[in-house]
Amino acid sequence: MDKMKDIKLIALDLDGTTLADSDTLSKRTHTAIESAIKSGITVVAASGRPFVMMPDSVMNIVGLDYAITSNGAVISKCGKTVHRSLILPDDVLKILGAVRNDDVILEGFIDGFTYADVRYVHRPLDYGCEPEYFEYTRSCHGKIVDMRSFLASIEMSLTSSAL
């Protein structure tokens, strides 16, 4: 138990691990997180989701102040962004060029919103999405028919992207 004193930070991936389903924590997990915080450990929620889609069941835990979101591109403290890693428009074009001959599903995070290929949103199972996340995927993603053109046409930096 003395080794627990050496732990300073716990980063918890949410989807498919910490969460019982797409939005809730089990009572046991909730209690364990609260216990860690009370013992002085910084607990960080981490997710591919944008911050606005982080579940209240996690973000409302007193003392859980930090979140790493948008596939690691955004760090927030108490709901305010403290760091963002952006993909510049020229780099977006390079990425699109690198996969131009591949049948890939593209997803982009822009200012807290998620945009995804309509094929992924309508048929998430075909692209590896777990059934318990279908509703989340369908509800939070902007449905774009031609993601390549959409991403190539934006004149702002992406917060994050996924292939």
Where are these predicted regions, by residue range?
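Active-site phosphate-binding/coordination module
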Residues: 27-131
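Asp-based phosphoryl-transfer active-site loop
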Residues: 6-23, 95
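Acidic, His- and aromatic-enriched active-site or binding-groove loops in soluble protein domains
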Residues: 123-147
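C-terminal cap/substrate-recognition subdomain and adjoining C-terminal extension
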Residues: 139-163
